[in-house]
From Swiss-Prot:
One of its GO terms (cellular component) is cytoplasm. This is Ran-binding protein 9. Residues 326-332 are annotated as: Interaction with CALB1. Residues 328-385 form the CTLH domain. The lineage of its organism: Eukaryota, Metazoa, Chordata, Craniata, Vertebrata. The gene is Ranbp9.
Length: 653
């Protein structure tokens, strides 16, 4: 740099740690997207308010701006997948509050221009980015384009910690690092530079790469690496740029556009290095013990999720014993299949039959299952509304209008129910014209005939009539069919399989097979047809409404007996909100109808069943994965950059 910089202020203290994300920068600094080389080429693009990772609102109807912001999000996510921006936001622009007064910002705080006198080094001015570089980046990179070198080209590009004096070029003070354009020197916390690279001027693109794994930094010029400039860098550094003479203008690219330098290739090199280190982790003489432990973890995982045949085969091949009886695994497997198929009523009844005291001891779990059953009724997938979808005119008019009463646990199931016995199979049986009986989807002979008769008339139905059919039910069932062989060979009689640990309901109903055949034949290409509430059946809608009243009564009784439960209250409110929309599937609360929402319910029920066998609620393999994920998060918070290239997902095949 021509001329030595002025001495730093006396008694310069080490910079304080960066402020939390919520206070790191003012809310008035809206970063944006990259701009063109000239003043007229830039397009103002609102981005994130400084200190926040939530996107700022765009002008209504401006699809181009929305698309640019989406592209920025995609690029940053691809470059830095391990970064949680809710916790550690990425730099996206320069901070209008963390700069010297001679610095001017424009074009969404991505363009920097000098507006001072520029007579002496005391007129130098710098600006920091809105946020420090997160360690979870592993490798971080940004570029600066020299729009104009101005009078003398006294420009510095680099890094600095929070609190470093902004009346200086980067690199002149402690915890400050810079590469200067007029002489090509690098400045490492000192006013004396070291020869490093070529000078840079108007039109050049200078990149700065921070390696948070080995704590080094190198620069690039027009896409070519210039080699290591700094080592032993401290954590929590901010991208920084400094100017000193009139006319100097630079533009920043924090990921708004593709970089000139191929930073992704450099990242791939380091990912390979980190993964090789993991693969070479020494086990020593404990390899046999290590393998045995892993085999037990895999076996327990298969048992936990009900992969019965696979668990048996794996146990044989590894000389292990399966901790849970196979009959018990199959029972859990049947229940899981029912839940994942949306047949909640049958799942509840099967659970009551196989594990009589389970839901009685867990009223909140029962309530969760019943709320999910209500959602499946809306969806048209639960058996209690599916069996009403035969479109018999009489059946739509003859459903009893009084809901099943709640009562004490001592009452007979045929006369009432309490929150401890709220299973459809234990309720009073409703009778319909055209159906002999329909309780929890177990349809008698006449009901089955009526149901399947409608299938044979399917080809002659009009579009409005087809709209009343729940065309998505069979597709959802198929989507959640287990890959395990045993899952495919189980047969149902009232939701309970051929074999049972407590010995009842051996053998499957002939009508169940016919029912499944009937369902299969009803799989038609109706993707263009709009779904309707409860499959469009009036009787099913009435049943759903009465069930909702029962659910409300159950909620009130739970509150009286067990106290207030905010989660239960919100769950019920969200479920009832589905009825406020003519098309619940495309409503703001429609995500509840997504089949994937069945999985947490299935997991909770499965864990509760396992606890009755004194088995862990979660498989050890899942706990180990969770612990590894938490460790990676701790590494990121501790500034260990290698966590960026050691994701758990890389080892899940």
């Amino acid at each position: 740099m021509s001329g030595q910089p002025p001495p730093p202020p006396p008694q310069q203290q080490p910079p304080p740690p960066p402020p939390p994300a919520s206070a790191a920068a003012p809310a008035t600094a809206p970063p944006g997207l990259a701009v063109g080389p000239g003043p007229a080429a830039g397009v103002p693009v609102p981005g994130l308010a400084a200190g926040s990772s939530a996107a700022a609102p765009f002008p209504h109807g401006d699809s181009a701006l929305n698309e640019q912001e989406k592209e920025l999000q995609r690029r940053l996510k691809r470059l830095y997948p391990a970064v949680d921006e809710q916790e550690t936001p990425l730099p996206r622009s320069w901070s209008p509050k963390d700069k010297f007064s001679y610095i001017g910002l424009s074009q969404n705080n991505l363009r920097v221009h000098y507006k001072g006198h520029g007579k002496t080094p005391k007129d130098a001015a710098s600006v920091r980015a809105t946020h420090p570089i997160p360690a979870a980046c592993g490798i971080y990179y940004f570029e600066v384009k020299i729009v104009s070198k101005g009078r003398d080209g006294y420009m510095g590009i680099g890094l600095s910690a929070q609190g470093v004096n902004m009346n200086r070029l980067p690199g002149w003070d402690k915890h400050s690092y810079g590469y200067h354009g007029d002489d090509g020197h690098s400045f490492c916390s000192s006013g004396t530079g070291q020869p490093y690279g070529p000078t840079f001027t108007t039109g050049d693109v200078i990149g700065c790469c921070v390696n948070l794994i080995n704590n080094t930094c190198f620069y690039t010029k027009n896409g070519h690496s210039l080699g290591i400039a700094f080592t032993d860098l401290p954590p929590n550094l901010y991208p920084t740029v400094g100017l000193q003479t009139p006319g100097e203008v630079v533009d920043a690219n924090f990921g708004q556009h593709p970089f000139v330098f191929d930073i992704e290739d450099y990242m791939r090199e380091w990912r390979t290095k980190i993964q090789a280190q993991i693969d070479r982790f020494p086990i020593g003489d404990r390899e046999g013990e290590w393998q045995t432990m892993i085999q037990k973890m895999v076996s327990s995982y298969l048992v936990h999720h009900g992969y019965c045949a696979t668990a048996e085969a794996f146990a044989r091949s590894t000389d292990q014993t399966v901790l849970e009886e196979l009959a018990s695994i199959k029972n859990r497997q049947r229940i899981q299949k029912l839940v994942l198929a949306g047949r909640m009523g049958e799942a509840i009844e099967t659970t009551q039959q196989l594990y009589p005291s389970l839901l009685e001891r867990n009223p909140n779990l029962l309530f969760t299952l019943k709320v999910r059953q209500f959602i499946e009724m809306v969806n048209g997938t639960d058996s209690e509304v599916r069996c009403l979808g035969g479109r018999s005119p009489k059946s739509q008019d003859s459903y009893p209008v009084s809901p099943r009463p709640f009562s004490s646990p001592s009452m007979s199931p045929s006369h009432g129910m309490s929150i401890h016995s709220l299973a459809p199979g234990k309720s009073s049986t409703a009778h319909f014209s055209g159906f002999e009986s329909c309780s929890n989807g177990v349809i008698s002979n006449k009901a089955h005939q009526s149901y399947c008769h409608s299938k044979h008339q399917l080809s002659s139905l009009t579009v409005p009539e087809l709209n009343s059919l729940n065309v998505s039910r069979s597709q959802q069932v198929n989507n959640f069919t287990s890959n395990d062989v045993d899952m495919e060979t189980d047969h149902y009689s009232n939701g309970v399989g051929e074999t049972s640990s407590n010995g009842f309901l051996n053998g499957s109903s002939k009508h169940d097979h016919e029912m499944e055949d009937c369902d299969t034949e009803m799989e038609v290409d109706c993707s263009q047809l709009r779904r309707q509430l409860c499959g469009g059946s009036q009787a099913a809608i009435e049943r759903m409404i009465h069930f909702g009243r029962e659910l409300q009564a159950m909620s009130e009784q739970l509150r009286r007996e067990c106290g207030k439960n905010t989660a239960n209250k919100k769950m019920l409110k969200d479920a009832f909100s589905l009825l406020a929309y003519s098309d619940p599937w495309n409503s703001p609360v429609g995500n509840q109808l997504d089949p994937i929402q069945r999985e947490p319910v299935c997991s909770a029920l499965n864990s509760a069943i396992l606890e009755t066998h004194n088995l862990p609620k979660q498989p050890p393999l899942a706990l180990a994965m969770g612990q590894a994920t938490q460790c990676l998060g701790l590494m990121a918070r501790s500034g260990v950059g290698s966590c960026a290239f050691a994701t758990v997902e890389d080892y899940l095949h």
